[in-house]
Amino acid sequence: MEIGLQHMTQSQEINKLEKSLSLIIMISSKELKLLLRNSIDSKIIDQNYSFYAEEIEIDKILSELKNKLKEFNLLNVVKVTLVLNNKLSVLVPNDFFQEDNCLDYLKFNSRLIKNDTASSDYIEELKTHNVYIAYGNITNYLIEKFGSFEYFHYSTVLLKKIHFELSTNKKIIIYVNINKSYLNIIVFKGRELNYSNTFDYKSKEDILYFVLFVIEQNKLVNNKTKIKLIGEEKIINQHYAYLLKFIKNIEIKNSGYLIENIVT
């Protein structure tokens, strides 16, 4: 009967949907993280993480990525997302943005090499474009392997996540995102972005220096400005007590800013 046939087809479709997976790849010059998760409930099915003490060449990262993907069962992957986390990015207000000038925007704060290609993410909430270096060898490989995928810069989703949670009051909040690769410092006044930058760091003293540098550069008074530490809880806890000795109005936010929580 057609009813039975229809029911069987629906069951097959539901079963197929339940088995569908999404693959998230996060790449920086020090990290390679792969997450395989269920497309329905975002439950992590498999993951692999590598951290390198020193920055490595992007060709080496591509080789590592190829090897890591061999360890995953990619049969039911229906969505692939690449997240690039590097310092090679700059925010350009929409009124000044021209697609053809992306590399020109970057050359003022990034060391470019021959054959570098640029891409951009539009952040609607901030009316700005996040311009960054896209690793051409990585994107070309993923096109060959998966056919299609989406990609964006880590700071794009980080800014979107923070902006979504902000209220309309005019309080100044400094977000200090500490991850193993870099230190992101972002300043909002209400829902207006005042500052965003990424720094290299090796010690808790470096973190303190850059936070105080941003406070001074933006003419903020540290005993009136709220500072929130975000990122991986284990890393934050390693630095919180030290920072608290010098900056009193500081607090730890939850781990909702981890890559697996802000990429859908």
Predicted feature residues:
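Hydrophobic/aromatic-enriched cytosolic interaction surfaces used to assemble or bind macromolecules
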Residues: 1-264
